[in-house]
Amino acid sequence: MNRNIAVVGLGYVGLPVAVTFGNKHKVIGFDINESRIKELKNNYDRTNEVTENKLKNTNIEYTSNAEDLKKADFIIIAVPTPIDKHNKPDLLPLLKASETVGKVITPDTIVVYESTVYPGATEEECVPVLEKYSGLVCGKDFFVGYSPERINPGDKVHTFETITKVVSGQTLEVLEIVADVYSSVVTAGVHKASSIKVAEAAKVIENTQRDVNIALMNELAIIFDKLDIDTNEVLKASGTKWNFLNFKPGLVGGHCIGVDPYYLTHKAQEVGHHPEVILAGRRINDNMAKYIASNVIKELLKQGLEVQGATVNVLGLTFKENCPDLRNTKVIHIIEELKEYGLNVTVNDVEADKNEAKKFFGLDLIDTKELKMVDVVLFAVPHKDYMENKKDYINLVKDCGIVFDIKGIINSDELNVSQRLWRL
């Protein structure tokens, strides 16, 4: 492999990609956030995806100067692809990154997109921007490929190197080059998709499939709750069959699973098909925070406790366990609902950045040692600390109080006799 690599976007996805390539090659790491560049130069990653030691031992030239990208002939773009308030794809970060690259791209460069998009977006949306700002012709002067990111934030087992990499290119020759570049660092190997659209579609259905399956579990949990059946016990029993899929109910947030299905449904509607199952799954999952909050109220009443002024400790704010990422977390909706009912809510998160919680949600996160006795403790996110010290947090629930368990980590025998357990 004889390519000069650059990675555009050094967040949860781009940084692990850059660091992994930097272990074997010299890499240019570009981000428009100058404070992020400064932190990385000081071997600090606020996402906790890459350790200080790994940052020290990788060969990356960090920069916020786009001119430095001229030194690269293999540019990987890994920027966020969110949705807007109407649940429509927001391609602005991707198009701005394409504009940045287009202004500095040199002939014979290959641009590979890793950002999750709907099928066709790379060639229909990104390529015209690259051509406009470069004055070059795609397929003649420069080329594109697509290799969807599969990073799982907080997961130290399934990493960039150990997950099979789907790769694609606009020609067979480009495909081979893209495969060769990624094969140099991805030990799990690569899968050569037959086209860029196939690779785009493969990525977007990975998370759509998961979203729909979790929605099914959430609907079952709602049904079983009305039937007074323990969902966890049902899943244990069903799980004894070899082909039963191991999905569990819960909140669906973050920048992938709760977002990507809308990219696919957008494209489906654009070509004249109204997707029913996918959108039904989205509705179920988006309503779970309201469902959980309403059950807090019901359980307080069952216990004979006053709703107005009832006290709650919410444990966990991030969108998933053992990860500081607050993007698109659904826990905030539970908190907002409880406050609307007049409850006094205290929020603790052992992983989240306090400044970001304040910036994004106006929340003041409380240190663990400052948590007080309350009517309700709600285990929202199963961070390692909460798992290992469950009893300490349960002991903060008053007699006749309630423990709410969103992820099925608490057993009834862990509670005091007068306390009540509600599990999703």
From Swiss-Prot:
SUPFAM superfamilies: 6-phosphogluconate dehydrogenase C-terminal domain-like, NAD(P)-binding Rossmann-fold domains, UDP-glucose/GDP-mannose dehydrogenase C-terminal domain. The lineage of its organism: Bacteria, Bacillati, Bacillota, Bacilli, Bacillales. Pfam families: UDPG_MGDP_dh, UDPG_MGDP_dh_C, UDPG_MGDP_dh_N. The gene is capL. This is Protein CapL. Belongs to the UDP-glucose/GDP-mannose dehydrogenase family. The keyword Oxidoreductase applies. One of its GO terms (molecular function) is NAD binding. It comes from the Bacteria. Keywords: Capsule biogenesis/degradation, Exopolysaccharide synthesis, NAD, Oxidoreductase.
